[in-house]
């Protein structure tokens, strides 16, 4: 970047420059190796926070379980998970008292969701623990495998396509004495290559049937697989995150639907809204506290931090909350919602890949899988790892650790927010019955607390009371990491508030630049990011113009498409110069074909092809966008595509950009090395799954796509649709009689084949 950074700060108020102190430029740190150590840390820490609870043994799986609920009240400031049931229930009751009908209405909304949600809801999401293969898979594949196994074991309620019916199968599967599954495995054999006469290793993929008894199946159904969270900025240590299997996901989805519906009605909740809507919500709470404190009162704000939010939460507490929230509802509904917390109370954490050992002297590397940690001699490990393993051993079963207390990251964000808000809600004067009162904001584990009181002593007393109330429900405000300021300056979910929200522009820095999808998408995403930041993040016109120039420069270097009249020599310059010389209207060439950049900050919303269309030579137009040109990628032309952009914190968010299909919208091919591994069988399944879905979409384009109702299979739906369409086309003269007859014949053949099968 050839920009003098000090120029950016000449007229910037100091508080607006906060964003430059964030660790958000450059590449974020990624983890390498296994997450086994981090997972053991999580399991051990969680048990330590609840160590004075009661130990029991799960009768089905034999797993030892620790229950800290209603445990001893804390006597010091150490984080602890001893939530008191009666306190949580009382907080819920007060929340309902100050928001009459909130639980009732949310239950009604959720009941509707439960009855309408289709099972394909579970295909959203990235990596999911696939219990049939005992490893992670894309969500759609994991769901397909689960349903396939269910059907081969006689569980067929899921065929209706409703999520609730799939969950009925899940419940039934847990009562079965055994489940039969298909697993992939790999055979290696040495054979002599005919051509080279050398010995080579041949790998073949096999599928084999395996029976799981009730105990093994339950352990798998209750397992969360763990991985290391990547790309976390500003931290020295990595940490583990969990991905649950398909048995748990559906139940969690409904619980979160209920909690989301409640959060939407709570003014202190930072979820589920985001962006500008969230800022408006927060500004309202601040305004309320400041107006009320004008003359007589002091008002202070704590930028809060909770210690290990997830590890001190407890699924048993969530069960109590759900039982209370749904207390007047039908029995079936209460049962469906109580299953997720019950499963989480019995969860098992999979320890991941295990440890890698290498001997420098003998040049040997060997993997110690997690399953062996229970029995292996500890002399091979260093001190810290040895301590971890010793501590976790009593909890181990088949390479998974029993983890009853605690919630893994990101599982019940909405429900835990409801718990946090219920404590903020207790700050009203009518509840504190004294001169101080509080309010605040809660978004998952992040909070901001605003305390008003006539004097400093009152403020202190209010903060203390809040702190102690939180302890009673298993929330541990960190005294070291929270800080207090006069109201008007605080930070909440990385929004900085100083008499209004300051744009924290550095958060967006990682999403500037060339994404690396293809020339067409990258150009479109790049300008859309700049446009969005002008709208949402105070990116001023001069800086935006500069960002645009830097982006174009970056883009040209990435794709080696410098202007046709430049002196820069690259691998592509010969072809680009040739095109430049034979083009009459040079302004019409796309930047990726060596053309000039016509973007400025006024026309960022127009796709480049549209911007230059009138300027293009006719034959160039014909090559660029011709559907008959084999290089034009034509997935059905959607006018809008989705890109995944990485903001600096939080999950990758999806961003829409305009997509025009041209010769530059190529799709890179899959890496071939996967084809030689045991995952090949899985990849083939995935491709078959993909092909079926694509075919189905051809028959039911999204404009007319109402889900086929009734029990018909995908094939039946497609055949009947083909017949209807063919008849309409024949009667309106769009197709000839022979074509019509041929289509009908194909349809009959397909039905005949299905009958024989």
Swiss-Prot record:
A GO molecular-function annotation: RNA-directed RNA polymerase activity
Enzyme Commission number, as recorded: 2.7.7.48
First-level EC class: transferase
Catalytic reaction(s) noted: RNA(n) + a ribonucleoside 5'-triphosphate = RNA(n+1) + diphosphate
Keywords: Eukaryotic host gene expression shutoff by virus, Eukaryotic host transcription shutoff by virus, Host cytoplasm, Host gene expression shutoff by virus, Host nucleus, Host-virus interaction, Inhibition of host RNA polymerase II by virus, Nucleotide-binding, Nucleotidyltransferase, Phosphoprotein, RNA-directed RNA polymerase, Transferase, Viral RNA replication, Viral transcription
Post-translational modification, as annotated: Phosphorylated by host PRKCA.
Location of the protein in the cell: Host nucleus; Host cytoplasm
One term under GO cellular component: host cell nucleus
Presence of the UniProt keyword Glycosyltransferase in the record: no
Coiled coil segments of this chain: none
GO biological process: DNA-templated transcription; symbiont-mediated suppression of host gene expression; symbiont-mediated suppression of host mRNA transcription via inhibition of RNA polymerase II activity; viral RNA genome replication; viral transcription
The keyword Transport belongs to this UniProt entry's keyword annotation: no
Biased composition (Polar residues): 55-64
Annotated region described as Promoter-binding site, given as residue ranges: 249-256
RdRp catalytic domain location: 286-483
InterPro entries recorded: RNA-dir_pol_NSvirus (IPR007099), RNA_pol_PB1_influenza (IPR001407)
Chain spans, region Disordered: 52-82
Chain location of the short sequence motif Nuclear localization signal per the record: 187-195, 203-216
Main localization category: host cell
Function: RNA-dependent RNA polymerase which is responsible for replication and transcription of virus RNA segments. The transcription of viral mRNAs occurs by a unique mechanism called cap-snatching. 5' methylated caps of cellular mRNAs are cleaved after 10-13 nucleotides by PA. In turn, these short capped RNAs are used as primers by PB1 for transcription of viral mRNAs. During virus replication, PB1 initiates RNA synthesis and copy vRNA into complementary RNA (cRNA) which in turn serves as a template for the production of more vRNAs.
Similarity comment text for this entry: Belongs to the influenza viruses polymerase PB1 family.
Assembly, per entry: Influenza RNA polymerase is composed of three subunits: PB1, PB2 and PA. Interacts (via N-terminus) with PA (via C-terminus). Interacts (via C-terminus) with PB2 (via N-terminus); this interaction is essential for transcription initiation.
HAMAP family xrefs: INFV_RDRP
Name the record gives this protein: RNA-directed RNA polymerase catalytic subunit
Organism: Influenza A virus (strain A/Chicken/Pennsylvania/1370/1983 H5N2)
Lineage of source species: Viruses, Riboviria, Orthornavirae, Negarnaviricota, Polyploviricotina
Gene coding for it: PB1
């Amino acid at each position: 970047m050839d920009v003098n950074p000090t120029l950016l700060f000449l007229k910037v108020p100091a508080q607006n420059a906060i964003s430059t102190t964030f660790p958000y430029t450059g590449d974020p740190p990624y983890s390498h190796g296994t997450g086994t150590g981090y997972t053991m840390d999580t399991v051990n820490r969680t048990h330590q926070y609840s160590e004075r609870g009661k130990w029991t043994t799960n009768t089905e799986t034999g797993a030892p379980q620790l229950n800290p609920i209603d445990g001893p009240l804390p006597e010091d400031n150490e984080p602890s998970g001893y939530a008191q049931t009666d306190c949580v229930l009382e907080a819920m009751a007060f929340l309902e008292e100050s928001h009459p009908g909130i639980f009732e209405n949310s239950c009604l909304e959720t009941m509707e969701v439960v009855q309408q949600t289709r099972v394909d809801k579970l295909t959203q999401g990235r990596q999911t623990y696939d219990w049939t293969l005992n490893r992670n898979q894309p969500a759609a594949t994991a769901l397909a495998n689960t349903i396939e196994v269910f059907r081969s074991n006689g569980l067929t309620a899921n065929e209706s396509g409703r999520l609730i019916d799939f969950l009925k199968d899940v419940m039934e599967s847990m009562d079965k004495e055994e489940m039969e599954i298909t697993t992939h495995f790999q055979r290696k054999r040495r054979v002599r290559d005919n051509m080279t006469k050398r010995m080579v290793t041949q790998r073949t993929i096999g599928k084999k049937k395996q029976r799981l008894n009730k105990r093994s199946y339950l352990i798998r159904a209750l397992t969360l697989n763990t991985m290391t969270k990547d790309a976390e900025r500003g931290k020295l240590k990595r940490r583990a995150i969990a991905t649950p299997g398909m048995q748990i996901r559906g139940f969690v989805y409904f619980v979160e639907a209920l909690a989301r519906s409640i959060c939407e009605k709570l003014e202190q909740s930072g979820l589920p809204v985001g962006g500008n809507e969230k800022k408006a919500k927060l500004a309202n709470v601040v305004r309320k506290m400041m107006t009320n404190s004008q003359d007589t009162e002091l008002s202070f704000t704590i930028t809060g931090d909770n210690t290990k939010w997830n590890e001190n939460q407890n699924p048993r507490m969530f069960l109590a909350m759900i039982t209370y929230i749904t207390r007047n509802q039908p029995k079936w509904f209460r049962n469906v919602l109580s299953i997720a917390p019950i499963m989480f109370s019995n969860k098992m954490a999979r320890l991941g890949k295990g440890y890698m050992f290498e001997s420098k002297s003998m040049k040997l590397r060997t993997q110690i899988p997690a399953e062996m940690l229970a029995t292996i001699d500890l002399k091979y490990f260093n001190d810290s790892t040895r301590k971890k393993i010793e501590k976790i051993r009593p909890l181990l079963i088949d390479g998974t650790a029993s983890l009853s207390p605690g919630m893994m990251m990101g599982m019940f964000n909405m429900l835990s927010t409801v718990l946090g808000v219920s404590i903020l809600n207790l700050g009203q004067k009518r509840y504190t019955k004294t001169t101080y009162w509080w309010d605040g904001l809660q978004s998952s584990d992040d909070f901001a607390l605003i305390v008003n009181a006539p004097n400093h002593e009152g403020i202190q007393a209010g903060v203390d009371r809040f702190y102690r109330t939180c302890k009673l429900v298993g929330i541990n405000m960190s005294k070291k990491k929270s800080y207090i300021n006069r109201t008007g300056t605080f930070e909440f979910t990385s929004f900085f508030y100083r008499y209004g929200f300051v744009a924290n522009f550095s958060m967006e820095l990682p999403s500037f630049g060339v994404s690396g999808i293809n020339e067409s998408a990258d150009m479109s995403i790049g300008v859309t990011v700049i446009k969005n930041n002008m709208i949402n993040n105070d990116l001023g016109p001069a800086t935006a113009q500069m960002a645009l120039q830097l982006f174009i420069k970056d883009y040209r270097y990435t794709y080696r498409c410098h202007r046709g009249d430049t002196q820069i020599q690259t691998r592509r310059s010969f072809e680009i110069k040739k095109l430049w010389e034979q083009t009459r209207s040079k302004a019409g060439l796309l930047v990726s074909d060596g053309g000039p950049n016509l973007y400025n900050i006024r026309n960022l919303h127009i796709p480049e092809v549209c911007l230059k269309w009138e300027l293009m030579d006719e034959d160039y137009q014909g090559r660029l966008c011709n559907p008959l040109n084999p290089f034009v990628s034509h997935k059905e032309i959607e006018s809008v595509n989705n890109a995944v952009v990485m903001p600096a914190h939080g999950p990758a968010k999806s961003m829409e950009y305009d997509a025009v299909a041209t010769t530059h919208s190529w799709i890179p091919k899959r890496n071939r090395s996967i084809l030689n591994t045991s995952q090949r069988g899985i990849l083939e399944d995935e491709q078959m799954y993909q092909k079926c879905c694509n075919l189905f979409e051809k028959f039911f384009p999204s404009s007319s796509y109402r889900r086929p109702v009734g029990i018909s299979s995908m094939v039946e739906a497609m055949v009947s649709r083909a017949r209807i369409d063919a008849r309409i086309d024949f009667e309106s003269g769009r197709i000839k009689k022979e074509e019509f007859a041929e289509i009908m014949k194909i349809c009959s053949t397909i039905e005949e084949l299905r009958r024989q099968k």
